[in-house]
A protein has these predicted regions:
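Alpha/beta-hydrolase active-site loop
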Residues: 77-98
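Alpha/beta-hydrolase fold nucleophile elbow
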Residues: 98-109
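The alpha/beta-hydrolase serine catalytic core
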Residues: 114, 126-188
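Gly/Ala-rich beta-loop-alpha elbow adjacent to hydrolase catalytic centers
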Residues: 108-112, 116
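Short beta-strand element of the alpha/beta-hydrolase
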Residues: 27-35
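N-terminal cap/lid segment of alpha/beta-hydrolase-fold proteins
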Residues: 1-25
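Short substrate-entry loop that stabilizes the transition state in hydrolases
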Residues: 37-43
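Conserved alpha/beta-hydrolase
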Residues: 45, 49-72
Length: 188
């Protein structure tokens, strides 16, 4: 299986780095999406991709903008809205490729999980299977995962700063606008 890296532009003109693994005897197509602050080569994202590759599915992985991968943007500006738009833009680009086929599979971790679920709600005819893994399901429920003081401090300072678990030594600084955007979404 050949691995190819391409750079496409999203609707905002930002570069999105995409990894293509096209199966020689393609039985289907899968888009695999990372979570907040993730990237396309994270070990668990590679495991998701391998499950499809082992079954002769071509796999498209990409770094959303505003993450720690190779695509444009800054992590502090990350939102569900921008991750979702990047997913739509990657799929729209893929529609013009010779290996594209519908319906396709979608797999996503955490924030990627809510994005693929939102896509499936909007375009159910395009989706054969959906695999949201440890998915965000509701902005409102997200606020219940930590105590009120945590979010009060975040809102007051405008940022949440913490060390990355996927890239040790890297500090993640995320704007409060991430929460404001997250509250717009609810799969329940």
């Amino acid at each position: 299986m050949k691995l190819e890296k391409v750079i496409i532009k999203n609707r905002k003109g930002q570069g999105i780095v995409v990894l293509l693994e096209i199966a020689p005897d393609q039985k289907g197509l899968a888009f695999v999406m990372h979570g907040l602050g993730g990237y396309k080569e994270q070990p668990h994202v590679e495991v998701f991709a391998k499950a499809f590759l082992d079954n002769n599915y071509s796999v498209i992985r990409f770094d959303t903008t505003n993450t720690f991968g190779e695509s444009d943007g800054n992590y502090e500006d990350a939102t569900i809205s921008n991750y979702y738009e990047d997913l739509e833009d990657v799929i729209e680009w893929a529609k013009n490729q010779e290996w594209y086929q519908e319906p396709f599979c979608l797999a996503g971790h955490s924030l990627g999980g809510i994005c693929i679920s939102l896509y499936a709600q909007k375009y159910p005819e395009n989706v054969k299977a959906l695999a949201p893994i440890s998915s965000v399901v509701s902005g409102k429920l997200s606020l219940e995962t930590k105590d009120k003081e945590h979010f009060d401090e975040w809102k007051k300072t405008g940022y949440r700063i913490k060390e990355s678990s996927s890239k040790p030594g890297l500090m993640k600084k995320l704007k409060w606008s991430h929460i404001s955007d997250r509250l717009k979404y609810d799969l329940i």
